[in-house]
Amino acid sequence: MIGDFGAANDAQRSVADRMCRYRKRHPFDHVVTTGDNIYPDGDPARFEAAFFEPYDCLLARGVEWHAALGNHDIIFDDGRSELSEPAFGMPRRNYVYRLLGLRLVVVNSNALDYEWLADATRARVEDRWTIVAFHHPVFSAGLHGSTPGFRPSLPRLFQRRGVDLVLNGHDHLYLATKKLRGIRYVVTGGGGATLYPCNPRWFVAFCIPRHHFLYVSLFADRIEVKAIPLTGPPFHAFSTRGL
């Protein structure tokens, strides 16, 4: 899981390199993004430098990507170039991906479709876990802060639907909230773009401006989330056991 990463700079390449090295001991076959995949505007002329080149060590080994659209991704052509590139794994602007008991709901928060989201988060019997990923944060203590208009409607919806984890980006930092209505909200915006400072907010459990990616593990009884820096062990970790 990464967000706010497609800057084609040294920080992005360092995070990508750490992902590739980490995968050798901690295998993963999927990468989910919280958007801002291609800075500054989603121009396909930058796909090679900002996506294919830094993540070649993952793409060449068949790692599947499931991207969300961020605000920068829609400037050039409303995101159409990213949507039409198979490597980003976006069949539509809003989509559901299901795998081995996981229901991953990926949302275009540039134009939030509440009715679609309410239906998409309605889990089936075979869905053990529901994770929702989109760009603009419900709760954030960074430069942009929490997104106006998302509260209280989205937290209430996610609680009703039994969502287990919400993953956002937009603010270039790492933030994990306290459990709010039984749900953890994470801002993972440290994939390569210039970092933003954290501000004190009542809902924050942990916040740090640091480049990173998330390693998310699914078990029968819990989800484990680890924030992985450029070097060294995870700097934050938590588990959630659902509502």
Residue ranges, per PLM feature:
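Secondary-structure transition/turn motif
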Residues: 6, 109-111, 187, 226-232
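Flexible loop residues that form catalytic
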Residues: 36, 137, 171, 221, ...
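Active-site glycine-centered loops adjacent to acidic/histidine catalytic or metal-binding residues
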Residues: 4, 35-36, 70-71, 135, ...
